[in-house]
């Protein structure tokens, strides 16, 4: 076991994580990583900005807020890259792991651009495609252990 302060700081991005998909986070942490930030549908992007309450049309402000969430379903998706870049610096990230759920095609397509963005900042990147089953836990552990070992 590694002391927490010496573990690589990992940002998890991509699809929502919950239920059995938490196996990715568990695998990262059991293999020596420290997940310090989630930039995914259930993470920072959903709470990053407040709704502008000082407006005559609060419904428009709510709609604007939801339409500006950095999501792979939105094109162009500049807001996701802005948030990701800010989080990489703010949390002093050592590496990024992107979680893609099988059949989530929008995140799968955008992973190419996320990889370019992250590696362009000089950080290691790994993409994990998984599902909600437990059938790939062995493969996840092998990949996460190798990825973290190279950091």
Protein language model annotation of sequence segments:
Residues 5, 30, 120-122:
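Short, well-ordered coil/turn elements that cap or connect secondary structure elements
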Residues 8-9, 25:
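Small-residue-enriched flexible segments
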Residues 16-76, 80-83, 87:
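Redox- and metal-dependent alpha/beta enzyme cores, enriched for Fe-S-associated oxidoreductases
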Residues 81-151:
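TerminUS-proximal long segments
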């Amino acid at each position: 076991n590694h002391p927490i302060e010496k573990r690589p700081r990992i940002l998890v991005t991509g699809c929502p994580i919950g239920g059995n998909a938490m196996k990715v986070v568990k695998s990262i942490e059991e293999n020596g990583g420290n997940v310090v930030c989630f930039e995914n549908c259930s993470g920072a992007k959903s709470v990053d900005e407040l709704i502008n309450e000082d407006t005559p049309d609060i419904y428009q402000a709510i709609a604007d807020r939801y339409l500006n969430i950095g999501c792979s379903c939105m094109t162009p998706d500049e807001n996701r890259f802005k948030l990701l870049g800010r989080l990489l610096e703010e949390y002093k990230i050592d590496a990024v792991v992107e979680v893609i759920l099988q059949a989530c095609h929008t995140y799968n397509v955008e992973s190419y651009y996320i990889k370019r963005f992250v590696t362009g900042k000089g950080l290691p990147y790994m993409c994990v495609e998984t599902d909600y089953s437990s059938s790939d836990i062995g493969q996840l552990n092998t990949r996460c252990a190798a990825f973290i070992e190279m950091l």
